[in-house]
Amino acid sequence: MKGNWSIVRKVLHRQFSTLRSSTPSSRLSTSIRPLVLAPNSISSLIARNSLFTASNIGPSIDFNFSNTSLPHRRSLCSEAGGENGVVLVKSEEEFINAMSKAQDGSLPSVFYFTAAWCGPCRFISPVIVELSKQYPDVTTYKVDIDEGGISNTISKLNITAVPTLHFFKGGSKKGEVVGADVTKLKNLMEQLYK
């Protein structure tokens, strides 16, 4: 998707490079109007103004610039949670219930404290999903520290950085990993839950 944006940006740059800052705004607006009114014409502009031909790009480019012919890459976005054995905690009540299960010993658990803006969290999130599949008897809770009512409760746990992972077994906290240390995370999971 990023590649398509760079192509569109180059085409638009070529299209409007002849315009100067002294050009009246009406000329600029009439130059842009066809793109705004007919966004699907962008693929024809790309075909005329680049090394690509219409047959190379074809119908795979549409207004949202999705191109399904590109190879899939590992996403750097934090997983949404809820699938793959990771439980997304959305409220203070859900967090308290999950923590109660972990502390009464009925459920071995991992609490993954994260934030949407956190780069290392996005890096380690696929590893956590993989480990939750590898250890299906361990419940992994994903907790966004910026989520509405959860922040007050989390502040009592002294979470000073994200990602932070707390590991519970037998009713008590057995370990903690702060940061995106994949080796330490995998070793601690194996040590506690194998």
From Swiss-Prot:
Does the entry feature the keyword S-adenosyl-L-methionine, yes or no? Answer: no
- Residue ranges of every copy of the Thioredoxin domain listed in the record: 89-194
Modified positions (Phosphoserine) in chain numbering: 75
Q: Using the UniProt record, give the first listed, main subcellular location.
A: mitochondrion
Where does the source fall among the domains of life? Eukaryota
Q: Which residues form the active site?
A: 118, 121
GO MF annotations, alphabetized? oxidoreductase activity, acting on a sulfur group of donors, disulfide as acceptor
What function is annotated for this protein? Thiol-disulfide oxidoreductase that may participate in various redox reactions. Possesses insulin disulfide bonds reducing activity. Reduced by thioredoxin reductases NTRA and NTRB.
Q: What's the name of the protein?
A: Thioredoxin O1, mitochondrial
Q: What is the lineage of its organism?
A: Eukaryota, Viridiplantae, Streptophyta, Embryophyta, Tracheophyta
